[in-house]
């Protein structure tokens, strides 16, 4: 009886904890009619949640243009705006992917790396991507940034194939899975209108600090250089 109650308690805890990775927020506004429409359209014909995840991931990766790669305006943040304008930095693309997945009742969160902007060292910037809960294996990280020469991010669970890896001493791969985007990310995107203006507002944190949604004190002066 005790074992049964313990299992029930754990199941309830996991269900409650997972709810935050399904929630509607100001940024992840998956209740927007166009996001719901697209989420249903992408899911159509796929019989498993894993197949839906793959389809959503590839759609955002390939159909939403990375703001720097294509030098496109405006700078987007909210999921519905990313969809409307079909462009966004890595952070914004992760917001739309999370929205599409949550609209399909698939838990999705946010992950971050600290990377050199030009692979040569300073300046550094955060890089944003997603973690998705797969029923058969748990959390799996994916990067819908967009592929190009030298970048080949794929959905190949259980193997993780991200766009980048932390290699330099001052780079970092933070393991926390956040239910909401970091506030410093949202603020950086909200204060810029153009893709080149955003280059001078790329958010950064100290690599020894595991960032939290309320983290502001570790914000470093943003680099003014090309995006990773």
Residue ranges of model-derived segments:
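Secondary-structure boundary elements
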Residues: 17-85
């Amino acid at each position: 009886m005790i074992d049964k109650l313990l299992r029930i308690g754990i199941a309830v805890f996991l269900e409650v904890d997972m709810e935050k990775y399904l929630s509607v927020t100001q940024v992840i506004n998956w209740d927007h009619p166009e996001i719901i429409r697209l989420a249903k359209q992408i899911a159509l014909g796929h019989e498993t949640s894993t197949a839906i995840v793959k389809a959503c991931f590839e759609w955002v990766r390939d159909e939403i243009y990375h703001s720097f790669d294509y030098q496109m305006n405006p700078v987007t943040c909210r999921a519905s705006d990313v969809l409307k304008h079909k462009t966004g930095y890595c952070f914004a693309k992760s917001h739309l992917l999370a929205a599409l997945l949550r609209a399909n009742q698939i838990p999705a969160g946010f992950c971050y790396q600290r990377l050199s902007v030009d692979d040569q060292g300073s300046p550094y910037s955060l890089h944003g991507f997603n973690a998705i809960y797969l029923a058969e294996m748990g959390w799996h990280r994916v990067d819908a940034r967009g592929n190009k020469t030298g970048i080949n991010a794929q959905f190949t669970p259980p193997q993780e194939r991200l766009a980048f890896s932390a290699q330099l001493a001052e780079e970092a791969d933070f393991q926390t899975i956040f239910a909401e985007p970091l506030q410093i990310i949202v603020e950086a995107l909200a204060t810029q209108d153009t893709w080149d203006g955003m280059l001078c507002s790329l958010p950064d944190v100290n690599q020894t600090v595991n960032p939290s949604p309320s983290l502001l004190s570790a914000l470093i002066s943003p680099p003014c250089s090309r995006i990773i």
